[in-house]
Amino acid sequence: MPRKTFKKLTTNDELISKVNPKNISLMEGFLREKSIRCAELTIKNYRSDLLVFFVWVLEFCENKLFTDIRKIEFSNFFSYATETMQWGSAKFARTKSTLSSFSNFIEKFYDDVYPEFRNIILRAVDSMPKELRREKTILTEEQVWDLLRHFSEKKEYQLVCWLSLAIGSGARFAELLRFTTDIIDENNLVFNDIFLETTQTIKTKGRTKSGKMLKKYIIKDIFLPHYERWLIERQKIMLKNGKEHNFIFIKKNGDIAKGSTVRSWCVKIEKYLEMPFYPHCSRHFIVTYLSRIGINADLIIELMGWSSVEMYKIYNDLSAKDREWKDLDKLKDSLDNDI
């Protein structure tokens, strides 16, 4: 079954056209300044968050200029967001951060126009306790191997190739669609010839406009057989439709696959599993799987391209009871000797 998150649209072109033009002008200046170093998706999210807020100001706060909005009015907006729009903690935190960044921008660049203005967001709005909005899916090894087998038997070769890349590399949703045939070389092996290393870097999530460029590591035996089988079918589709490009994943007409293509595969996987499935759970799976079989955390962090152990802790779903604790042998020996 699909994961469900409440979503209520509060903006449209007609309402946006009525928003205080000074607020729109400030927003556009903010986005231009941020676009120098922020990724396109970050800019898109900034714009979305600000427009939702400005439409609320239009409807409930007399279309005030942003610099005139009081602390209680910011608080009222976030109350409305949680009670009426049913925002979760992640959306709440992101929008709060957006409004705070926007305030800092005005304070820094428009101090001559609004000399009395100060960023009051952090003081006016308390953080929302983090909560799990969606049921977390923890895949077992048996489920993953069965998925690959089942969809191979169904001749869903592209779906299987995508899934094997997702669980074999731990790459994110957007990153998986950036993989191309020219960065996969079956002879470019590392770490005892167990992992394929991409021949070039790909754009991963990062704070800068260009993201973080990293080479990706893929467990060869999980991915390569399914990749090679899909390439045969892919070539047939490309020739039939007269298309030429090197992206691994494609639509039925040979065009480059989009997020909607992947989401359709996720629906098929969910129906077979009879439980929620989303691309990110494959990232949890590979980290947990490697941890369970005893791979050192330092190597896992290197494979994932992380800069700290904190991300490892987030994605490792092993409970304390699942892990092997060598120190327990010392306790057992002590009990055997002392009792």
Question: What is each stretch, according to the model?
Answer:
Residues 219-274:
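Active-site/catalytic core of tyrosine-dependent DNA strand-transfer enzymes
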Residues 304-329:
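Catalytic-site neighborhood detector that most strongly recognizes the C-terminal catalytic loop/helix
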Residues 28-44, 48-134:
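N-terminal core-binding DNA-recognition domain of tyrosine recombinases/integrases
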